[in-house]
Amino acid sequence: MFDIAPVSRERDEQIQACIDDKTKPRGALGALEPLAAHLARLLGEAPEIGRPAMLVFAADHGIASAGVSIAPPEVTGQMVANFAAGGAAINVFCRQLGWQLEIIDAGMLSAPPREMGVTDCRLGAGTGPIHKRAAMTLGQVEHGLAFGRERVRSHHAEGTNLIGLGEMGIGNTSSAAAVMAALMGLEAKDCVGRGTGVDAATLKRKQMLVEQALLLHLDMLTSPESVLACVGGFEIVEMTGAILGAAELGIPVLVDGFIATTAALAAVKMFPQSREYLIFAHRSAERAHGLMLAHMEAEPLLSLDMRLGEGTGAALALPLVQAAANFYREMASFSDAGITDVTP
């Protein structure tokens, strides 16, 4: 379904030489230097971030009705209305930092009014309760991957060469934990966290329900696609499709926190070469996030103890990505500036 080329390493020596010849001691820009090299591989000799687009996928989860969150299921729709009105954290950050923001209904309980301006990519009215039955069908997974790819292609046609991913969905940390456990061969207790900030009793119930879901679907968890069908979320599936669609186009993706990283994990399990197109924005306060980052050998750009979702961490990482591209493209070399290179 996806045709993803591995990233060429033919220019690596040339790229590193370019970075080392900038008017600075070698390595003095720290983590910005490998980030700049990564962008030069993906975007060419003069990398420049054009029209960055933040895609926020919203969906509801059947497991939310079992009381795994501090918020009831209807809050998903209420927050999407807040996004549409421009009042959420992701709106503030996108306005400040120059992101193009698109809100996408991947499968909320109720479709928002057309005048709200939310893109319709609905796969259903929320997933099935994963502790009782499958979240969705394999056909819905296929359609969701295609929806995610199509949204990326639409932005790319307008000049976008960097995609940010965010999400909204009450109950989605439970689904994400189940997906993570199934894809990494872990137990529920290793993957379930406090999400929206639940108390100890709710955390115990959440862990029990995720364990129940994994046991119920054990014989079906044989591929990334079947894992998504059994225990995933509509927004997780569509983010996975967006990642694969961006990789297919050869453009990088800024991955947000725990939920978005679960989609990244699914994408990498489907197409390992898609890993090379991912930039991980921040380390979430959600405990299990670090396990996924380590599994994918990822070092995030930021660590701010955030756990909001919405794409907020990815949004805040944009200036660092721009700075890496800009210094690679604009910073003078020693010879250009007439400075003696004393680097040993």
Curated annotation (Swiss-Prot):
Transmembrane segments: none annotated. InterPro entries: Nict_dMeBzImd_PRibTrfase, Nict_dMeBzImd_PRibTrfase_bact, Nict_dMeBzImd_PRibTrfase_N, Nict_dMeBzImd_PRibTrfase_sf. It holds the Pfam family DBI_PRT. The keyword Disulfide bond does not apply. Its EC number is 2.4.2.21. Pathway: Nucleoside biosynthesis; alpha-ribazole biosynthesis; alpha-ribazole from 5,6-dimethylbenzimidazole: step 1/2. SUPFAM superfamilies: Nicotinate mononucleotide:5,6-dimethylbenzimidazole phosphoribosyltransferase (CobT). One of its GO terms (biological process) is cobalamin biosynthetic process. HAMAP family: CobT. PANTHER family: NICOTINATE-NUCLEOTIDE--DIMETHYLBENZIMIDAZOLE PHOSPHORIBOSYLTRANSFERASE. Belongs to the CobT family. This is Nicotinate-nucleotide--dimethylbenzimidazole phosphoribosyltransferase. The gene is cobT.
